Swiss-Prot record:
Lineage: Bacteria, Bacillati, Bacillota, Bacilli, Bacillales
Alphabetical GO biological process terms: thiamine diphosphate biosynthetic process
Localization: Cytoplasm
Keywords: Cytoplasm, Schiff base, Thiamine biosynthesis, Transferase
Organism: Staphylococcus carnosus (strain TM300)
Name of the protein: Thiazole synthase
GO cellular component, as recorded: cytoplasm
Chief location bin: cytoplasm
Keyword Cytoplasm among UniProt keywords: yes
Gene (name only): thiG
Length: 255
C-alpha cells in the first residue's frame, strides 16, 4: 500500500496523461497500467471552460486519485498560482511542485522548489516536490514537512533510465516519507531498478505514451514495478568479487 498524506493507493505506478496519440490509446493504456493515480499539467486542463477540449474527457476521474502538477512554472509565484487554480477548481489538494530552472536540461530549480513547498505547506496542501537526485535537498524538504519527495531518474523525456543509482539509494535510505522516482524512465527495466533501490513508487509518462505500443508498455511497467518491489522486499544476495559454488560439496569423496 502506497500512502501519501491521506491518500492510499494499491498500485505503485503513477501515470502521466500527456503525449498520447489519441484518447482511445490513452484510455486503454491507463487501464493496462493498473494505476490508481493520474497526473497532469494544470495548464493543459480546461478547468473552467467546459466548451474547450478536455484531454481526459473519456476517463472516469472518480476512479482515480488526480494528481495535478505545476509543469510550466519557472518561478515560485507561477507554481503557487497554478496550485491555487487546481485547488479552487476542486481537482485535488495534492500537488506535484515542478519548477524548471534550465530550459535546455529541464532540470528543476532547487531553491524555488523549496520556497514554493514552504508556502504551499503553510496553505494546507499535500506537497510532493520534483527534484534532481540531490541527497541533501531531499532531506531538507522532508524536514520542511513535504509528504513525498520525487527525485528524477534522469532528465525529463530522455528515457536514459537511472543516471545516479547511488544518490537515489542514499535518498531512499535516509527518507521517512515516500520516495517516488520521476522522469527519465525509458523501459520496464528502469522502473524495476528504481523499485529494487527501494523507491516507494515510480511516476512515468513518455515511456508509455511514446512507446511503439503504449498499451503493452503500460502493462510492462506495471509488471516491472511489481517485480522490482518484490525483489526489494525479498532482499537480494550480497555482491561478491569471487565465485562461490552453488552446488553442495558433500559427497565428492564418492567420485
Amino acid at each position: 500500500m502506497l500512502k501519501i498524506g491521506p491518500y492510499e493507493m494499491e498500485s505503485r505506478l503513477l501515470l502521466g496523461t500527456g503525449k498520447f496519440d489519441n484518447e482511445e490509446i490513452q484510455t486503454k493504456a491507463i487501464e493496462a497500467s493498473g494505476t490508481d493515480v493520474l497526473t497532469f499539467a494544470v495548464r493543459r486542463m480546461n478547468l473552467y471552460d467546459k466548451n474547450l477540449p478536455n484531454p481526459l474527457a473519456n476517463v472516469n476521474l472518480k476512479d482515480f486519485v488526480t494528481f495535478p502538477n505545476t509543469a510550466g512554472a519557472k518561478t515560485v509565484d507561477e507554481a503557487i498560482r497554478i496550485a491555487e487554480i487546481a485547488k479552487h477548481a476542486g481537482v485535488c489538494d495534492m500537488i506535484k511542485v515542478e519548477i524548471i530552472g534550465d530550459d535546455e536540461t529541464l532540470l528543476p530549480d532547487p531553491i524555488a522548489t523549496y520556497e514554493a513547498c514552504e508556502i504551499l505547506l503553510e496553505r494546507g496542501y499535500i506537497v510532493c516536490p520534483y527534484i534532481a537526485e540531490d541527497v541533501v535537498l531531499a532531506k531538507r524538504l522532508e524536514e520542511l514537512g513535504v509528504h513525498a519527495v520525487m527525485p528524477l531518474a534522469s532528465p525529463i523525456g530522455t528515457g536514459r533510465g537511472i543516471n545516479n543509482p547511488l544518490n537515489l539509494s542514499y535518498i531512499v535510505k535516509n527518507a521517512n516519507v515516500p520516495i517516488i522516482v520521476d522522469a527519465g524512465i525509458g523501459s520496464a527495466k528502469d522502473a524495476a531498478e528504481a523499485m529494487e533501490l527501494g523507491a516507494d513508487a515510480v511516476l512515468l509518462n513518455s515511456a508509455v505514451s511514446r512507446a511503439k505500443d503504449p498499451v503493452k508498455m503500460a502493462e510492462a511497467m506495471k509488471l516491472g514495478i511489481e517485480a522490482g518491489r518484490l525483489s526489494y522486499e525479498a532482499g537480494r544476495i550480497p555482491v561478491k568479487y569471487t565465485a562461490q559454488a552453488s552446488s553442495p560439496s558433500e559427497g565428492l569423496g564418492f567420485l
